[in-house]
């Protein structure tokens, strides 16, 4: 049986460990808050990135799904869509002045990637502005954010004048940023659901 002195020492030890645990939690929350205060500005400045994911295009007449690989390097934007067994559906490149689409064995050119994609495939996707809406750093007066400043929803016009409702369902934290992992774009009766993973930055 332990003595009264041993019992008190043990109680003090338990209390000390408890307070150390609380202090560690408080420090962790403080570090997370510090990271949050700057993450959105830094993320908006990141112009070189790559992300993989899945995409579902839903309209009243059809539903199509694909894997996506999306890359941006400065002003160059490159989107590749493949089937779930890896067969390439299309690749779309946008530079400062030119858009190039490889689709169905043919090569097409325009000045606007969003318009080119819609004209030849019927697939509406605001490719030109992906650097902002895909990362969730879009800046618009209709933007709604959560308590951490992450985008929740926005009503926004793309480069061709189409109005989109974008809903951000979930985020993942990586490299000090909150990055969208699930989002939905809606234009009239067209809905595009996107799941993103494996964000990479250079």
From Swiss-Prot:
GO terms for biological process: lipoprotein localization to outer membrane; protein transport. InterPro entries: LolA/LolB/LppX, OM_lipoprot_LolB. A lipid is attached at residue 25 (N-palmitoyl cysteine). GO terms for cellular component: cell outer membrane. Keywords: Cell outer membrane, Chaperone, Lipoprotein, Membrane, Palmitate, Protein transport, Signal, Transport. It holds the Pfam family LolB. The keyword Glycosyltransferase does not apply. A lipid is attached at residue 25 (S-diacylglycerol cysteine). It comes from the Bacteria. CDD domains: LolB. Residues 1-24 form the signal peptide. The keyword Transcription regulation does not apply. It is a lipid-anchor. It is found in: Cell outer membrane. Plays a critical role in the incorporation of lipoproteins in the outer membrane after they are released by the LolA protein. Belongs to the LolB family. Monomer. This is Outer-membrane lipoprotein LolB. It comes from Pseudoalteromonas translucida (strain TAC 125). The gene is lolB.
């Amino acid at each position: 049986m332990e003595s009264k002195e041993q019992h008190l020492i043990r109680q003090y030890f338990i209390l000390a460990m408890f307070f150390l645990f609380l202090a560690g939690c408080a420090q962790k929350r403080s570090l997370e808050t510090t990271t949050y205060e700057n993450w959105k500005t830094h993320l908006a400045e990141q112009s070189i990135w790559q992300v993989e994911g899945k995409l579902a295009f839903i309209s009243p007449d059809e539903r199509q799904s694909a894997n996506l690989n999306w890359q941006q390097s400065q002003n160059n934007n490159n989107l590749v869509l493949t089937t779930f067994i890896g067969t390439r559906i299309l690749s779309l490149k946008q530079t400062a002045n030119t858009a190039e689409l490889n689709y169905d064995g043919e090569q097409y050119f325009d000045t606007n990637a969003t318009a080119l994609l819609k004209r030849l495939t019927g697939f509406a996707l605001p490719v030109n502005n992906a650097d902002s809406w895909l990362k969730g750093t879009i800046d618009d007066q209709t933007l709604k954010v959560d308590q951490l400043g992450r985008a929740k929803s926005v009503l926004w016009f793309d480069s061709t004048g189409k109005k989109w409702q974008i809903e951000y369902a979930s985020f993942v934290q990586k490299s000090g940023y909150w990055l969208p992992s699930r989002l939905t774009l809606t234009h009239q009766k067209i809905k595009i659901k996107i799941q993103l993973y494996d964000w990479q930055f250079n």
